[in-house]
Amino acid sequence: MSILLLIIALTSLFPSRPANAIAYVMPVSMTSGAWPRVEMDILSWSEASGVTNPCYGSTECWIGPDVLYASGAPSLSGSCLDYGNCIRINQYRTAEEVAAAFRSAKGIPYRASFVIDSPNATCIGLFYVNHRPTAGVRNAIQWPGSVCGKIPPTNQTCSISLPSFVDHGAISNTSLNGKTNSVSGNIACTQATNINLFARSTTGERYVYLNSTPNFYSNPLINNQSGWNGANMNISGNNASNPFTFTSELHASGTVTPGYYTGNAVVIIAFN
């Protein structure tokens, strides 16, 4: 059999808990001033089948990116109405249809840019509101399964450089369990900082399942530590390279049918 693990690298996210659905959102930048402009990316968005859209049947409902403020919820008015980052979703019965509609309208990955009401923003994610977004009416709700990515410190920008896949190649059943393969990556930040680096499946689970059963999976590791628990790293500034290792560790119980298997993992920076 042949096994390939695909990797997505993200920065500035809160680590998520296990979920059947998850939207990964990455803050890119935020300017200073009373009315900051933020940039963010929606990197991936998956939904479990059959989950009801929480605002299905409402007279009007919108979804899009916005920030959570220290004082509470956002309004979505700037992001939706002024900058066109949102779609109307009250007509879709399921969350899976909502994700598909957003992907069709905007594309994923999707980069959004918009001005917010205050510099006191804590994180950025996907939000919805079951009426037309209105300036000053801050009652938008975080979309179930959306990561709220922690906004980095002022003037701090970090990036991850990492191969997009780990190729285990052809492996026999007798040598499968415990087999590892690693790739090297680098993190660069404008300022010195301390981070935790996490790895997990793109659906938010601890392991990357490689077939339809839980008996065949990859356990992602960072610097030979559990990707789920995270590895702490001190990062130098001035955009210097700080190396790390990503490892895919295979596990199987029983015989795996020969074939070609792939899975999707995500590597996440969380600022401390």
PLM region spans:
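N-terminal hydrophobic targeting signals that begin at the initiator methionine
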Residues: 1-2, 23
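Bacterial N-terminal signal peptides
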Residues: 2-12
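N-terminal signal peptide c-region/cleavage motif recognized by signal peptidases
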Residues: 13-18
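Mature extracellular/passenger domains of Gram-negative fimbrial/pilin and adhesin proteins
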Residues: 20-272
